[in-house]
């Protein structure tokens, strides 16, 4: 008789992208970005092959990507930066990790001191 193998519960990988500030300002389209992710995320080396392995959900200005297989948070950042570059938003927005499972889009900080000195 073969020894029984203990099946470990599958770990679900889940990451969140917080797009609150750019969406409220009207410079970022979350619906378009969600579609971009669905088309570009690779599963088993093929794009557009999400199937039942990867799920992408959108709730107002937050996008959640959950996967049954191992999924890299860094890959999500790479795709976000690629989208920003494609839509000429890379000069104004950056992708920042706000915690272990969340990325946030923030504006670059432009110092006001430099501008006020040059005006005087």
UniProtKB/Swiss-Prot annotation:
Gene3D superfamilies xrefs: 3.30.1360.210
Pfam family, one: Ribosomal_L22e
Gene Ontology CC terms, in alphabetical order: ribonucleoprotein complex; ribosome
GO BP field: translation
Keyword Ribonucleoprotein on entry: yes
Keywords: Ribonucleoprotein, Ribosomal protein
Superkingdom assignment: Eukaryota
InterPro entries listed in its UniProt record: Ribosomal_eL22, Ribosomal_eL22_sf
Identification of the protein by name: Ribosomal protein eL22-like 1
Annotated family: Belongs to the eukaryotic ribosomal protein eL22 family.
Gene Ontology MF terms in the entry: structural constituent of ribosome
């Amino acid at each position: 008789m073969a020894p029984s193998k203990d099946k470990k519960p599958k770990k679900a990988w889940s990451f969140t992208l917080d797009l609150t500030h750019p969406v409220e300002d009207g410079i970022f389209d979350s619906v378009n970005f969600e579609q971009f992710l669905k088309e570009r995320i690779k599963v088993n080396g093929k794009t557009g092959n999400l199937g039942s392995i990867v799920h992408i959900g959108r709730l107002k200005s937050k996008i959640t990507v959950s996967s049954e297989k191992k999924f890299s948070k860094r890959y999500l950042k790479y795709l976000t930066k690629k989208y920003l570059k494609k839509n000429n938003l890379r000069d104004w927005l950056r992708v920042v990790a706000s915690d272990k499972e969340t990325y946030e889009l923030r504006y670059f900080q432009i110092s006001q001191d430099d501008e006020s000195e040059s005006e005087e």
